[in-house]
Regions:
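N-terminal exported-region signature
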Residues: 1-166
Length: 166
């Protein structure tokens, strides 16, 4: 197993953690790599302060979402911060900000996920808390039929097509 952070990682080898990732930071996002069957993960710690300020630099930023449940991107990220964000990538899903709003398969941020925010300028922001009902809801995980099973790669690409003739 291993943990990937923004510009850092650690792998569990022969009973010890090896790598440059020495601690887990609340405001940072992480991807946990496991091989084989489904793994149950126990996480210990205190909830992240919902007023945590996130400082994004220009480029790719791997960040957390501090709330339980989920909330729509356009509601939870303040408008001024959205203007600096080109796109957001999650595990196997993404969204891109256009003149018409957010497009793509990623519509909501979830407290159990880490996200790559791609920005064209530095911006500091605090998430807007989800509305009362959304904080307690969890998006269902879609089951994939076994004949279409796959392993999620940490190397992914997304394409947004404006026009297509079929």
């Amino acid at each position: 197993p291993g943990i990937l952070g923004e510009g850092t990682s650690a792998n569990f080898v022969d009973g010890q953690w090896l790598g440059t990732l020495l601690s887990i930071e609340r405001e940072d996002g992480y991807w946990i790599k496991v091989s084989g069957e489904t793994v149950e993960l126990e996480v210990e710690g205190l909830p992240t302060d919902p007023n945590t300020e996130y400082s994004l630099h220009s480029g790719s930023n791997l960040v957390s979402y501090p709330f339980a449940g989920h909330a729509p991107i356009d509601e939870t990220i303040p408008v001024y911060a959205q203007e600096a964000i080109i796109g957001i990538m999650g595990e196997g899903t993404s969204a891109m900000l256009t003149e018409d709003g957010w497009l793509g398969g990623l519509l909501e941020l979830s407290g159990t996920e880490g996200y790559w925010f791609i920005t064209d300028e530095a911006v500091d922001f605090t998430y807007n808390p989800p509305t009362d009902g959304m904080a307690r809801m969890v998006s269902p995980v879609r089951d994939v039929p076994s004949e279409f099973s796959y392993r999620q790669s940490t190397q992914q690409a997304f394409y947004f097509v404006e026009n297509a003739t079929i």
